Regions:
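Residue-level signal for inorganic ion chemistry
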Residues: 31, 76, 136, 167, ...
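ALDH superfamily catalytic-core signature
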Residues: 162, 195-287, 325
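Conserved C-terminal structural/oligomerization subdomain of aldehyde/semialdehyde dehydrogenase
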Residues: 273, 282-371
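N-terminal Rossmann-like NAD(P)+-binding subdomain of aldehyde/semialdehyde dehydrogenases
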Residues: 1-103
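Rossmann-like NAD(P) dinucleotide-binding subdomain of oxidoreductase/dehydrogenase enzymes
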Residues: 92-231
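Short, well-ordered beta-strand elements within core beta-sheets of diverse protein domains
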Residues: 18-24, 114, 222-223, 253-256, ...
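Structural signal for hydrophobic packing residues in well-ordered secondary-structure cores
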Residues: 20, 24, 39-42, 46, ...
Length: 371
C-alpha cells in the first residue's frame, strides 16, 4: 500500500475526530438534511449503481433494484422519518426516591468505521451508514475488494453527498482495511465472515472500541407434518436461491419426518425446475433442538408449522440471532425487529431504532429534585 493512502487515512480520521464536538450538538433537522443529501445521491446514481453491481456479481436487474437500491432507500427514509422520536430523552423514573427521576439520553459514539461485504455490497454498507449518520456520527467506509465496480460508484455517491469530514470512503484491498483497523475508531461495524469478524474484534479491542459484527452461520429450517409442503417449498426455494444462494440468512438444512422427506424433496425439485416455486409428522423435538444446539448459534432459524406448542418449544429450546415462523429471509426487511447474530453469528443488532441505538451511547442521567 502506498504511503500516500496511509497518510490520507490518518489525515481523514483526525479531521473527523475534530468534528465530534459539533456533531454531538447536531439537531434532528441537521441530521435529516444530511440523510436527504445521501438519499438524493443514491437516487441520482441509481442506474450506475445497478450496472456496477451487475458487473461485479452478475445479479439480475430486478434483484439489484429491489434489494440493493430499494433496500438502501428504505433504510435512509426510515431513519429520516423517525429521528425526533429516537433522539428524544426517555424518562424512566427512579427506584431511589419519588422525588427523583431518571432519563436516558442518546449521544453519538464518534468516528465510526463501516466495512461492507461482497454479497450485497451496496445495501449492507449503506444501510449501516444511514444508521450511523442518524445517530450523529461521522463515518469512514470501505466496501469489499471483491466488488470494485460497486466500490467505485459508492465512492461517487458518498463524495457527491458529503464532505470527507462527515463521511469518507477508501478503496483498495486488504492492506487498506488493515490500516483502517489500526485507527482508534469509536465504533466498528463489520459485515462478513466469522473468521474475519474475529480479526476485526481483535483490532477493536486494542482501542476498546465497540463493535457490531454481522456474521453468518448455518440456518436450520423445521417443517411440521401439518404444514402445507408446497407453501414451505416455495418459500424455502426463494430464500435459498435468491442472490445465487449468497444470503447470510438463507435456509441451510431441514428437519422433516422421514416418511415425508421424499415427497417434500420431489415438491421442492418441481418448484425449482419450474423456475420459481411450485408442490406425517415432524421429527422428535428433542432431536432437532439438540442438533441445532450442538452447532454454532445460527444467524436465523425457521419453523413452518401451525402448531403453537411446537413453535414455542423450538423458540424456547434453541438460540439464534433471529427466527421466522412460516417464512424465510423476509424478516430482514422488517425494521420493527432488530437484526443481528449471537456469538459466532454476530454481535449487536441494527435496523430501525435498533440501528440508531447501536451507533449511540445510551447515557443514564439521575436527577434529584432541588430543595
Amino acid at each position: 500500500m502506498e504511503q500516500q493512502v496511509k497518510d490520507d487515512i490518518q489525515r481523514v480520521f483526525q479531521l473527523q475526530k475534530k468534528q465530534q464536538k459539533a456533531l454531538r450538538a447536531s439537531t434532528a433537522e441537521q441530521r435529516r438534511e444530511k440523510l436527504q443529501r445521501f438519499l438524493d445521491s443514491v437516487i441520482a446514481h441509481e442506474e450506475e449503481i445497478i450496472e456496477a453491481i451487475r458487473k461485479d456479481v452478475r445479479k439480475p436487474y430486478h434483484e439489484v433494484k429491489k434489494a440493493e437500491i430499494e433496500g438502501t432507500k428504505k433504510a435512509i427514509r426510515d431513519n429520516m422519518n423517525n429521528l425526533e422520536q429516537w433522539m428524544a430523552p426517555k424518562e424512566v423514573g427512579s427506584s431511589l426516591s419519588p422525588d427523583a427521576n431518571g432519563i436516558l439520553m442518546y449521544e453519538p459514539k464518534g468516528v465510526t468505521l463501516i466495512l461492507g461485504p461482497w454479497n450485497y455490497p451496496f445495501m449492507l454498507t449503506m444501510a449501516p451508514l444511514a444508521a450511523s449518520l442518524a445517530a450523529g456520527n461521522s463515518a469512514i467506509v470501505k466496501l469489499s475488494d471483491f466488488t470494485m465496480n460497486t466500490s467505485n460508484i459508492a465512492a461517487k455517491v458518498i463524495r457527491d453527498a458529503f464532505d470527507e469530514k462527515e463521511v469518507a470512503i477508501f478503496e483498495g484491498e486488504v492492506e487498506v482495511a488493515t490500516e483502517l483497523l489500526d485507527q482508534p475508531f469509536d465504533h466498528i461495524f463489520f459485515t462478513g465472515s466469522t473468521n474475519v469478524g474475529k480479526i476485526v474484534m481483535t483490532a477493536a479491542a486494542k482501542h476498546l472500541a465497540s463493535v457490531t459484527l454481522e456474521l453468518g452461520g448455518k440456518s436450520p429450517t423445521i417443517i411440521d407434518s401439518e404444514y402445507d409442503l408446497m407453501d414451505a417449498a416455495k418459500k424455502i426455494a426463494v430464500g435459498k436461491f435468491v442472490n445465487a444462494g449468497q444470503t447470510c440468512i438463507a435456509p441451510d438444512y431441514l428437519f422433516i419426518k422421514k416418511d415425508v422427506q421424499d415427497k417434500f424433496a420431489g415438491i421442492l425439485q418441481t418448484v425449482v425446475n419450474a423456475g420459481f416455486m411450485e408442490d406425517d409428522h415432524t421429527p422428535d423435538r428433542s432431536k432437532f433442538t439438540q442438533i441445532v444446539n450442538d452447532r454454532d448459534k445460527p444467524l436465523a432459524l425457521y419453523v413452518f408449522s401451525k402448531n403453537q406448542d411446537l413453535i414455542d418449544n423450538v423458540l424456547q429450546h434453541t438460540t439464534s440471532g433471529n427466527a421466522a415462523i412460516n417464512d424465510v429471509v423476509v424478516h430482514f426487511s422488517d425494521v420493527n425487529l432488530p437484526f443481528g447474530g449471537v456469538n459466532t453469528s454476530g454481535i449487536g443488532s441494527y435496523h430501525g431504532v435498533y440501528g440508531f441505538k447501536e451507533f449511540s451511547h445510551e447515557k443514564g442521567v439521575f436527577i434529584q429534585a432541588s430543595k
